[in-house]
Amino acid sequence: MMLHIPGVLTKEQVAQCRDILDAADWADGNATSGAQSALAKRNRQLPEGSPAARAIGDAIQDALARNALFFSAALPLKVFPPLFNRYAGGDAFGTHVDNAIRLLRGTDFRVRSDLSATLFLEEPDAYDGGELCVEDTYGVHRAKLPAGDMVLYPASSLHHVTPVTRGERVASFFWIQSMVRDDADRTLLFQLDTQIQQLTAEKGGRDASVIALTGIYHNLLRRWADA
């Protein structure tokens, strides 16, 4: 499942993030690449653990903690500290799959990458190219979203970023370890939760069908979740 999550950051928050990012020192994006990714990747990246990355990453994680749609879809157990990249002048990232395990350098913190997230920090009309293209059995799905919006997709997916031929594409990217490892199970829970919320809005939280379906949701979560 590929999901668009609008308004993770407000426009004011995006502007504040960009002020910090535009003043920061950027490095070769291959500093965090695995062997396969290094063959396909050409971009710039904010060094892991830099003061700018930590400050903006904390703001993003605070915003995610308040985002009900993100929680419902991801059921997050761990979130890898957000990283940041920029593409310009023909930069691109060829087709690849993300590493299964992400280790935070200098620590014992590690995340199983069940989900990948890209949070856009530049408006789509400010650059040409730079589309995130995610492949699945139904074809290729493209994302080039407004600044502050995020796309969430299975980390097991083949994906690439098309060349940026005008302007620059700036984004945050990170990985989530979900309480529910299996993508199909997680998607089913998300669909069920969405319907429960809609039914609650129509009939109220005391309706018998709402109570019954909520019980089913939690029993499925209890069966599938690692916490």
From Swiss-Prot:
Its cofactor is Fe(2+); L-ascorbate. Its EC number is 1.14.11.-. The keyword Membrane does not apply. InterPro entries: Oxoglu/Fe-dep_dioxygenase_dom, PKHD_C, PKHD_hydroxylase, Pro_4_hyd_alph, Pro_4_hyd_alph_FE2OG_OXY. The keyword Iron applies. The lineage of its organism: Bacteria, Pseudomonadati, Pseudomonadota, Betaproteobacteria, Burkholderiales. GO terms for biological process: DNA damage response; intracellular iron ion homeostasis. This is PKHD-type hydroxylase BTH_II1201. SMART domains: P4Hc. Gene3D superfamilies: q2cbj1_9rhob like domain, Rabenosyn, Rab binding domain. 2-oxoglutarate binds at R169. Keywords: Dioxygenase, Iron, Metal-binding, Oxidoreductase, Vitamin C. Binds 1 Fe(2+) ion per subunit.
